[in-house]
Amino acid sequence: MEGSMGVSAHQRFDLRTACDWWAVFRLAVMTAVPLAFAAGSVQGQDPHVPGLIPNGDVAQGNIGASDATAATIGTHPLEPALELAQRGLVQLKSTIKDYSCTVVKRERIDGKLGEHEYLFAKVRHEPFSVYLYFLAPEAMKGQEVIFVDGHNDGNMLAHAGSGVRAMVGTVSLKPNGALAMQGNRYAITEIGVENLAKRLVEVAEHDKQFGECDVNFYPNAKVNGRICTCVQVVHPVPRRNFRFHLARVFIDDEFLIPIRYEAYDWPHEEGGQPVLMEEYTYMNVKINNGFTDADFDPKNT
């Protein structure tokens, strides 16, 4: 990170004294996949619904609702979507070793929908490695984050871009700790198109046990110029064991990877519109760059 991420003993930051600084800095560590790390349970989230609970808001429109009934005999509407997701995941695992991209995310946390955040990302699948550089908004520009599975005692390294914040130096944080999760729905360990594909399969396998599910396919959709198949899933009736009211997944037709995901809560008032909970887009994806350990070395990035 332009030499800024090398960590010496005197640079390590005592997190016990970090609270006041963190309230100002609020280093936003991004993840783009729709499932997360957070301790405890959240009101409205059935503990049997698959996936980790997001930090912040889960669906509110199904609080106090009953469970969906079991699906009737026959082909479930989700089966074609599940087959497409499974096929894409198999192809991804066998053909994509790493990629770079621009990530655009927007999340609702504590009832407030945040602004769009833009990040440049490098991701390697084995061992799982992530480098993030924040492009926008201006308050986050220049911030950098590195995570490599099995390195740095399982922690991520974060550094501010410039100004007073950069004087703090490099911070080593638990990926799913309270400080790293502040302002984020998901941990950095859940970022990436492979993690997104896995979670989509998990949720689809869960939801196809039940009825009250409408699925539509929209071919030739476009995301930043890429031709995609859009899969839209709607649970029309609020039910405790569903994660969302409406979700759209855009599958890149060439790579068979999900490059955009958006999820909505049920309307919070009668006659209201679905409420956006989260959206993530992977743009300018360049696969198989041959990334090595050097690409995720804090002294080199």
Feature locations, PLM:
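Gly/Pro-enriched, hydrophobic low-complexity segments
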Residues: 110, 135, 157-160, 166-167, ...
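Compositionally biased, proline/threonine/alanine/serine-rich low-complexity intrinsically disordered stretches
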Residues: 42-76
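Residue-level detector of bioactive/disordered segments in secreted/extracellular proteins
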Residues: 21-24, 103
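N-terminal secretory signal peptides that target proteins for export/translocation
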Residues: 1-22
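Short secondary-structure junctions and interdomain/linker hinges
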Residues: 35, 95-99, 207
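N-terminal mature ectodomain segment of secretory-pathway/periplasmic proteins
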Residues: 76-164
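Bacterial N-terminal signal peptides
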Residues: 17, 24-38
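Residue-identity detector for glycine
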Residues: 3-6, 40, 44
